[in-house]
Amino acid sequence: MSKKLTFQEIILTLQQFWNDQGCMLMQAYDNEKGAGTMSPYTFLRAIGPEPWNAAYVEPSRRPADGRYGENPNRLYQHHQFQVVMKPSPSNIQELYLESLEKLGINPLEHDIRFVEDNWENPSTGSAGLGWEVWLDGMEITQFTYFQQVGGLATGPVTAEVTYGLERLASYIQEVDSIYDIEWADGVKYGEIFIQPEYEHSKYSFEISDQEMLLENFDKFEKEAGRALEEGLVHPAYDYVLKCSHTFNLLDARGAVSVTERAGYIARIRNLARVVAKTFVAERKRLGYPLLDEETRVKLLAEDAE
């Protein structure tokens, strides 16, 4: 029997596969975020006319999902492998199935289903047509064609493939608990992450200073606005991410009511929309450098009319 892939070998296999499909291999973005979609490598690059093909691992923090390291399938922080391709290849689903084969999962021998699950992220004004991918009854991937990002219609269409690495690894390695996943030869997932899981859960649910978090949200929101006034898209978006994570900590702590929750989400969404519009304007001002010359000249001429 062949040796099962370790967690890091799964990552390496996916990186090599999507590299071969023309994706740039980006690194995880250094701000807390709830999903790989919120990385600027997806959120910003999915809008505007320029092509963009990228793949990266993104640690994703969801404070409300923390379970003190006691739940075998639910985590404060999990890892996503994010693929974003714009314009979307016509054979993106076939490429995805081929990537599973590279991981030793033969689609002809397993029950693989694309279950309709249209996606929406209210806090960033983003939505798209989507499917959950179920492997023998377990969700392992989210598949999305973005229709709107930051309140802006997307065009060309961007395809996003988000692998849940822990779920995928637990299936491949045939373990019931995420903490039993072999990260590398002789090193278990739990030996690396179970203590951080406990500590972050304790902090999120019991220890975090609610007043400080409320003040920080206001400060981060204000600073994002100041950066936008200067046309500084990327620093502004960093503060949008900080607002989002701070809100998630407040939400986990039970510090916001249902009414207040909607208000905080709207504040984040309003900032994200301004960031998106400013980014598109910035790329136009720069002359859409990632476009081929013929398309670039044509588009700039149309914009000038």
From Swiss-Prot:
GO terms for cellular component: cytosol. One of its GO terms (biological process) is glycyl-tRNA aminoacylation. Its main location: cytoplasm. It is found in: Cytoplasm. InterPro entries: aa-tRNA-synth_II/BPL/LPL (IPR045864), Gly-tRNA-synth_heterodimer (IPR006194), Gly-tRNA_ligase_asu (IPR002310). Keywords: Aminoacyl-tRNA synthetase, ATP-binding, Cytoplasm, Ligase, Nucleotide-binding, Protein biosynthesis. It is an enzyme of class 6 (ligase). The keyword Protein biosynthesis applies. It catalyses: tRNA(Gly) + glycine + ATP = glycyl-tRNA(Gly) + AMP + diphosphate. One of its GO terms (molecular function) is ATP binding. CDD domains: GlyRS_alpha_core. Its EC number is 6.1.1.14. Belongs to the class-II aminoacyl-tRNA synthetase family. Tetramer of two alpha and two beta subunits. This is Glycine--tRNA ligase alpha subunit. The lineage of its organism: Bacteria, Bacillati, Bacillota, Bacilli, Lactobacillales. The gene is glyQ.
